[in-house]
UniProtKB/Swiss-Prot annotation:
It comes from Saccharomyces cerevisiae (strain ATCC 204508 / S288c) (Baker's yeast). This is Lethal(2) giant larvae protein homolog SRO77. It comes from the Eukaryota. Residues 932-958 are annotated as: Disordered. Acts as an allosteric regulator of polarized exocytosis by promoting the targeted fusion of vesicles with the plasma membrane. Involved in maintenance of ion homeostasis in cells exposed to NaCl stress. May be involved in the targeting of the myosin proteins to their intrinsic pathways. Multicopy suppressor of RHO3. May also participate in the maintenance of cell polarity and bud growth. The keyword tRNA processing does not apply.
Length: 1010
């Protein structure tokens, strides 16, 4: 007749719980406030990546208008750009500037030193490509109009020098206006650049202000051309899509839209060889050839010319576009060219054969992955040669924002989490589910000391952070699309190490597809792990010493592998997989058993701390496993025993407490279902030393929707009743522990006494995302420490409710400090210390605290308003290696070596203003003035192929030494002249005065035969 008001409901709750001890211990609202502790992952999808070798920093730009810069361990600095621009290009300059170009052709200059945005420059025309050098202030900007602007990053101004569209003005005036397609600085001479337009490629000299050489690729009728050539009966001019220098700068490569790869001689402009990925001499006419334009072939979209530590040993890495044809998976091709023949003694025919017959070719398939849109080589030897100097890691960027890591040249893919910072682990590959859990502090810290923590990035210095005082640590577990599960320390602001445990179910299941992780359960006291794949296989792991560590496969191993090739061949539900653990892991999470029930997708999984594992399937089956056997002790469909018509189990909780009026405690397994029904089971010892499961009751507890979570606590003390080994051992004493159980439904929370009654009920206006109990230590006015048990509820609208128990009375309503995503917020977790891990997006989660630690008295130094300290990115002690120079042959031909100082004069003029930023003065000390200075600051071994800078002498005393060096080279056999003279090239360059320089050059020419 009358609707029950909220006030009457609160009174009813208070009356019901009046006789029960308030385990929240009178906690009040002043103890609570929200603060974001840290963020895991990235906001948005990655669109661009770039790497700085000297500072060892990696930067990624996302669709959310953010640029993340990563260093060693957990170092991360985020630049948030106004208006969320989409970044197209990004480069590091001098290690201290980060340049970004957005889709509207704005140039954004960021300081790695001050971590500030220095300026934004608007470009009057659309930017099609850019080029920078790690050691120079200048940025070359290719425009849609075909012109090239030169931007002085350090002075924040454009150079007066503007390079015209040479295709239109000089070579092909009748062709339509071509944009600049590609720009590359000469790897040995900053005075020249390689420019490509749609139909022609030129070498331009800053010193002479003119084109020094041009390259025009034209196919005669019936020449096959590349894989995508059409109209072969006509003369064609395939458009250029990219051009590259050979690391020695003596040859170039032009890449064309028909997949032609054309090698040219820089000095003469002569075509050396034209090929495609698989075919050679594709520029030679063949009248018998038929038009193959209907043959579907993936188009090349990017090529990198990689070199080993000795830059004369090179290879090509070629990426092709994805097609819709499933029979043509996207691939990356490696063409290993091997050592480059000596230019001075190799004919054009011999050089053509060199490019036609590489040492080897490999195809790296990307089958099953999203389309590849870009790749980034990560060099180990120097920042030069286009960032391709001695790389064994290639970072692949996929269309969906995922990152893959290609081991080069082996061709295998590595998703090893510790290689890069934890935030990038969310996209290597995509996280499919995540949970967070509280772990005993000493146990956790001991376990994490042996976790993998090696990192490719070495840059940056972590900021000093305040350590929060908690008796527990927080573990973050992420499941990924490739079947891997990673276990991290969630306390990002307190732990700077990159330590992570990683397990991979692909090897355990012996499968390459359908591996995505859907459910994870972690027993934090017994260090056991249970995970389920998307097709319903459940894999059990335990933290232990690996008995197969370091073992090589035995002679009968092949037969064993064949017999276990597929789990589908197994006739039993439980499959022993203890021999499928990694042999290179001495101690860690080792697989033990797979539950291969063939029941379809898993709806719920719980690995208890007392050795029992419960697995619920969408089709209704509930399996309970005792890991001590292992043995299945229960296997039934809950649809048979449900009283309310439940279809499947949605969540499981194991606890030790009194059931009804038993007078003693029991192991209870509480199962929530899809319609809000609570099903109670007892786990009892059986006569044969095993355990048995007894169904006791089923009660409809929540209004609507599935049950999201179940928790329990003792009525008298407020401590958790979750099942542990110590509580299980105490059962023999017959002690009764009266307890409450909290059940979270779609939009309500019910508190019940198992086997007795439904007690308090709380209803919320918005649906519940997640909820849980937290156990908060409080120092009262007398200085006494007491425990306050509270219920924290996160709603999907961003409200955070703090409730007392058992009354479920609201103490405070807080607003979540991070935006929520309805699609991912259910992957959030409430932790025992008052923290909440909230998944905010596909690639991101945040750790927040609702506890005001200074008010609780547990940490007087805590300041909830204090901002998170920012890491240091730039290290001024690191020197940029000296740039490689032209070799002896180019010097002998008359190539004038251009110094950075001379280039500054050529591009900036003699009236170039003073530096605008302090970054310039800081970076100036990090540019090596000689190779010896560079060698002192760079990793050992990198000086083997370093090029000494010539130093001009004020006197003539060094002239005799130079001539003596030349004469020794002349006496050496001709085939070693080019090799040995490189050692003298820099000695001869600028150490001679004008007269001695001319004399030495004449002698060199006669020695080589010019």
């Amino acid at each position: 007749m009358f609707k029950k008001s909220r006030h009457l409901k609160n009174v009813s709750n208070a009356i019901k719980s009046a006789r029960v001890h308030d385990v929240s211990n009178g906690i009040n609202s002043k103890f609570f406030d929200t603060k974001k502790i840290c963020t895991y992952g990235i906001n948005g999808r990655i669109t661009v990546t770039t790497f700085d070798y000297t500072q060892s920093l990696l930067a990624v730009a996302t669709t959310a208008g953010e640029i993340h810069v990563y260093g060693q361990k957990q170092i991360e600095v985020v630049f948030t750009l106004k208006n969320r621009p989409q970044i197209k290009h990004m480069r590091f300059i001098k290690g201290i500037y980060l340049i970004a170009v957005d889709e509207k052709s704005n140039i954004i200059v960021l300081s790695v030193h001050s971590k500030q945005i220095l300026t934004t420059v608007f470009c009057p025309n659309s930017i099609t490509c850019i080029e920078t050098d790690p050691s120079l202030d200048w940025m070359l900007i290719g425009l849609e109009s075909g012109s090239i602007l030169i931007y002085d990053v350090d002075r924040n101004q454009m150079s007066k020098l503007k390079i015209e569209n040479f295709q239109k003005s000089v070579f092909l005036p009748k062709e339509r206006l071509s944009p600049v397609i590609s720009i590359q600085w000469n790897p040995r001479d900053i005075g020249t650049i390689l420019i490509s337009y749609e139909h022609i490629t030129v070498i331009y000299s800053f010193i002479d202000y003119k084109v020094k050489q041009h390259f025009f690729y034209q196919l005669e009728p019936y020449a096959p051309g590349g894989d995508l050539s059409t109209n072969i009966e006509k003369k064609r001019t395939p458009k250029v899509i990219q051009s590259l220098y050979h690391p020695n700068s003596l040859h170039i490569l032009t890449v064309h839209e028909d997949n032609s790869l054309v090698f040219w001689d820089v000095n003469s402009g002569k075509l050396i060889h034209a090929r495609s990925i698989f075919e050679t001499h594709v520029n030679f006419p063949n009248p018998a050839l038929k038009d193959c334009s209907f043959t579907e072939t993936p188009a090349i979209f990017k090529v990198s010319w990689l070199c080993q530590r000795n830059p004369e040993y090179t290879s090509l890495l070629i990426a092709t576009k994805a097609t819709e044809n499933p029979c043509l998976p996207q691939e990356i091709t490696m063409i290993d060219l091997g050592g480059t023949p000596m230019y001075s003694v190799t004919s054009f025919d011999a050089m053509s054969k060199y490019y036609a017959k590489p040492v080897q070719q490999k195809l790296f398939s990307l089958i099953g992955k999203a389309p590849l849109i870009n790749f980034l080589p990560l060099p180990k030897a120097s920042p030069y040669f286009g960032g391709c100097h001695d790389t064994n890691l290639i970072l692949l960027l996929l269309e969906d924002g995922e990152l893959e890591t290609l081991i080069y040249p082996a061709g295998s893919f590595s998703s090893k989490a510790s290689i890069f910072p934890r935030s990038l682990a969310w996209v290597r590959p995509t996280v499919t589910t995540c949970i967070a859990q509280s772990v005993q502090k000493n146990l956790w810290l001991g376990m994490m000391t042996i976790a993998q923590s090696e990192s490719f990035l070495k840059g940056g210095i972590p900021a000093t952070r305040n350590i929060r005082r908690h008796e527990t640590r927080s573990a973050l577990l992420t499941g990924h699309s490739n079947g891997s599960v990673r276990i991290w320390d969630a306390s990002h602001s307190e732990v700077t190490d990159n330590a992570v445990f990683e397990v991979n179910t692909a090897k355990v299941l012996n499968r390459a597809t359908n591996l995505a992780i859907k459910n994870i359960s972690f027993a934090s006291e017994t260090l056991e792990l249970a995970v389920s794949s998307e097709v319903g296989d459940v894999i059990l792991f335990k933290f232990e010493t690996n008995k197969f560590y370091g073992q090589l496969p035995k002679s009968d191993a092949l037969q064993l592998k064949f017999s276990r090739f597929s789990l589908d061949d197994s006739k039993t539900i439980l499959v022993d997989v203890s021999d499928r653990g990694p042999t290179n892991v001495k101690q860690g999470f080792i697989p033990s058993t797979v539950i291969h029930a063939k029941k379809g997708a898993v709806s719920a999984i719980m690995n208890s701390n007392i050795g029992f594992v419960a697995v619920g399937f969408i089709e209704g089956t509930l399996i309970i496993l005792d890991r001590r056997g292992p043995a299945i002790i229960f296997n039934e469909n809950i649809r048979v025993i449900s009283k309310a018509g439940s279809s499947y189990v949605s969540t499981v909780h194991f606890c030790v407490m009194e059931y009804g009026d038993d007078g003693f405690s029991s192991i209870l397994m509480l199962c929530g279902t899809d319609i809000g029904e609570l099903m109670t089971f007892k786990i009892l010892p059986a006569t044969n030393g095993r355990f048995e499961v007894k169904f006791t009751d089923a009660t409809k507890t929540n209004n609507q929707g599935k049950i999201l979570g179940i928790n329990s606590f003792a009525k008298d003390t407020g401590y958790s009743c979750s099942a542990t080994i110590s509580k299980m051992q105490g059962l023999s004493k017959g002690i009764a522990i009266p307890g409450f159980v909290t059940i979270s439904g779609a939009n309500d929370i019910r508190l019940v006494s198992p086997g007795k009654s439904k007690d308090t009920h709380a209803l919320f206006k918005y649906p519940i995302a997640t909820s849980g109990l937290s156990f908060i230590p409080i120092i009262d006015g007398k200085g006494e420490r007491k425990l306050s048990t509270i219920m924290i509820v996160l709603l999907i609208n961003g409200d955070i409710k703090v409730l007392t128990v058992p009354e479920l009375k609201e103490v405070k309503n807080l607003r979540c400090p991070v935006p929520l995503s309805a699609q991912y917020v259910e992957n959030s977790s409430i932790l025992e210390n008052g923290d909440i891990v909230i998944r905010t997006g596909k690639f991101q989660a945040s750790l927040i605290s609702v506890l005001n630690e200074s008010a609780t008295g547990t940490n007087h130094t805590a300041d909830i308003s204090q901002h998170t300290p920012i890491d240091t990115l730039y290290n001024p002690d690191l020197k940029i290696g000296y740039r490689p120079q032209v070799n002896s042959l180019q010097w002998a031909r008359g190539t004038i070596y251009c110094t950075p100082y001379q280039l500054d004069e050529l591009l900036g003029g003699i009236e170039r203003p003073e530096s605008k930023y302090e970054e310039s003065a800081i970076a100036r000390g990090c540019i090596s003035s000689s190779s010896s200075n560079a060698a002192r600051k760079l990793p050992p071994g990198t000086e083997d192929h370093r090029y000494a800078r010539p130093v001009r002498s004020s006197g003539r005393s060094n002239g005799y030494g130079v001539l003596k060096s030349v004469s020794r080279a002349i006496e050496t056999r001709l085939d070693t002249v080019e090799t040995t003279i490189n050692d003298y090239a820099t000695t001869m360059g600028q150490t001679m005065n004008d007269a001695m320089e001319e004399t030495g050059r004449d002698m060199m020419k006669s020695a080589v035969g010019f």
